[in-house]
Regions:
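Catalytic cysteine-centered active-site loop
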Residues: 167-217
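Hydrophobic/aromatic-rich core segments of domains that either
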Residues: 214-227
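Core beta-strand residues in small-molecule sensory/regulatory alpha/beta domains
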Residues: 38-40, 112, 224
Length: 282
């Protein structure tokens, strides 16, 4: 009888992935530019987040060709094994990977591998061993900490610079397609500030801001459809009444003035619930 390994090698697409078969306690890394994380092990289900190229995740469960993973920020989701490969041990603590990884992090770049194949990487992806940057920008951790300090004006500038023109995509975390909480988490992570992935999680981070008039740049504004309902939207304050956000009602990236009188803005203001200050000195 053929071994599990020999049976797996019968499918050329699964050769590299066959190593995952007994790897429930192992870690994986994304080999695609973006690996969609879904709510169920089914390609037809909803994307809840994304594992970016070079990022590491812990495997919690396996169902057929699907892996239930937990990303470095603790977010769970199902990813098809075609998007990932097993990471050799030892694996560094997940808190030291992802956006805190010392490897060059893409600011939007193109890389070439040892087979001379090129690939575009979005903001937040990691350039891995054997890849050479041939276009765009990528920075190792030490340079990122200097270029992207944990300061309010720098964080808001990054949100506006990198995500301008981005289309709305549920579960997205990059300028290739992003949702409201993805804009927040990616913008803050770039500056070394850890915030949760979802808006309702972000709503319990930091310190409360008593009123909208007290909001400062890089504070977060939270919105819900019902006064006591679950938080469903988040925006980043630019100071005063201006915000930057990824909004379904705007089709994606938008800078809005909450003092405006258009119908969308008036409805948004009605949904405002509270603010939070993530930075100690915003």
């Amino acid at each position: 009888m053929p071994s599990k390994t020999s049976r797996a090698t019968s499918d050329a697409r699964q050769v590299d992935q066959g190593r995952l078969a007994g790897a429930l306690s192992e870690h994986v890394t994304a080999i695609a530019a973006i690996a969609p994380m879904l709510c169920e092990p089914d390609v037809k289900t909803t994307q809840v987040s994304q594992l970016l190229h070079g990022h590491i995740a812990m495997v919690m469960e396996r169902k057929g060709l699907w892996l239930h993973i937990k990303s470095a920020d603790g977010y769970p989701g199902w990813v098809h094994q075609g998007y990932v490969v097993t990471v050799p041990e030892p694996v560094p603590p997940l808190a030291e990977t992802s956006w805190n990884d010392p490897r060059p992090l893409s600011l939007g770049c193109t890389v070439r591998d040892e087979h001379n194949a090129t690939r575009k990487l979005p903001l937040g992806a990691l350039v891995t061993v054997g890849q050479e940057r041939v276009g765009g920008l990528a920075m190792p951790l030490a340079e990122r900490r200097e270029s992207f300090p944990a300061k309010a004006d720098s964080i808001t500038a990054s949100a506006m610079t990198f995500f301008e023109g981005t289309s709305y995509e549920w579960g997205g975390v990059t300028p290739w397609g992003c949702d409201c909480s993805g804009l927040v988490s990616s913008s803050f992570h770039l500056h070394g500030v850890n915030v949760p992935r979802d808006a309702w999680m972000q709503a319990s981070t930091g310190a409360p801001v008593d009123s909208m008039s007290e909001l400062r740049p890089a504070d977060l504004l939270f919105f819900s459809d019902e006064p006591e309902g679950k938080i469903t939207h988040v925006a980043i304050s630019l100071g005063g009444t201006r915000v930057v956000h990824l909004a379904l009602g705007r089709g994606g990236y938008a800078v809005d003035d909450l003092a405006a009188e258009d119908e969308y803005t008036k409805l948004l203001v009605k949904r405002y619930r509270f603010g939070r200050r993530i930075l100690e000195t915003a």
